[in-house]
From Swiss-Prot:
It holds the Pfam family Self-incomp_S1. Belongs to the plant self-incompatibility (S1) protein family. InterPro entries: Self-incomp_S1. Residues 1-18 form the signal peptide. It is found in: Secreted. Restricted to floral tissues. This is S-protein homolog 1. PANTHER family: PLANT SELF-INCOMPATIBILITY PROTEIN S1 FAMILY-RELATED, PTHR31232.
């Protein structure tokens, strides 16, 4: 009996996916409710070091190595991705400047981070005293982590 229920549920779900897509209030569609879209995100790292020095960054996830980047003052590096269905997408970066370095998480599944990033765009700015995250809710950069001394 359990197998029959699962089979019928699978058929109903398949039919729902193939049914005509109706647009609801606010642009949401019936298909969006049945199969929610995977969130699209952008992470940006900005060199805001007022000393004019170059910022070295190396960002990666479990699946993707984004390479080593040397960012000149006021330049930025961005990447786009879709959050996976298990909500385990995770990016981190190693950053280095003349007299400091850090390993820092720049994207992970966290509702507070999502709120600060405006549910789509996390902007990290390296400044002389540390790394700041743009809080879109408050409209200001918030110090997230201070530089570790040395290389």
């Amino acid at each position: 009996m359990n197998c029959i229920k699962q089979f019928l549920l699978a058929i109903c779900f398949s039919l729902a996916l193939t049914c005509q897509d109706h647009v609801l209030v606010g642009g949401t569609t019936t298909r969006d409710i049945i199969v929610p879209k995977i969130s699209e995100w952008q992470v940006t790292v900005v060199n805001g070091l007022t000393t004019g020095e170059t910022l070295f960054i190396h960002c990666k996830s479990k699946e993707d190595d984004l390479g080593e980047i040397n960012l000149k003052f006021r330049n930025r590096f961005s990447w786009n991705f879709g959050e996976n269905m298990l909500h385990s997408t995770f990016f981190w970066c190693y950053m280095n400047k003349d007299n400091g370095h850090m390993n820092v998480n720049v994207f992970w599944d966290d509702v507070i981070l999502f709120h600060r990033c405006g549910w789509k765009n996390c902007i990290w700015t390296a400044k002389t005293d540390g790394l700041y995250l743009w809080n879109s809710a408050s409209g200001e950069d918030v110090l997230s982590r201070k530089w570790e001394v040395g290389w």
